[in-house]
């Protein structure tokens, strides 16, 4: 009797572990990076990718007559992107056209699917306040921050001396997710 109970208990534990691993695998296909302290978040957009919230920043540009928002995430497989906009979505364009992204729109939320890395411009009612999305593949060959040939900027805000970064021969500049 004890042997049957032990076997049943082991099977239940194995099934629970498999279920937990499958949940982790599903959630592991999207990586979003926390917003660094001091970055201004956009009040125009909210982005969610497969249920994962993605911070949306206000871009710092020289074009003071326009507002730009940016967001980025890493992913693999096919993901569902939901963008909530305070701007009208009546005349929405997603560029470039080569990706042929045609979202479904329900009031203030646009939903579409991505299955490959891309950089796109989400432009509600023209391009006065676009959201630029950097949709990257999952990283596989992350350089070591201890490598003497790597200039490594980890998550957070960085202000290089004099605003310049000088690379020497055979040096690599690496910006980790969440670095600005």
What is each residue range found by the language model?
Residues 1-10:
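N-terminal secretory signal peptides that target proteins for export/translocation
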Residues 14-23:
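Bacterial N-terminal signal peptides
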Residues 24-180:
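Extracellular/periplasmic carbohydrate-active domains that bind, remodel
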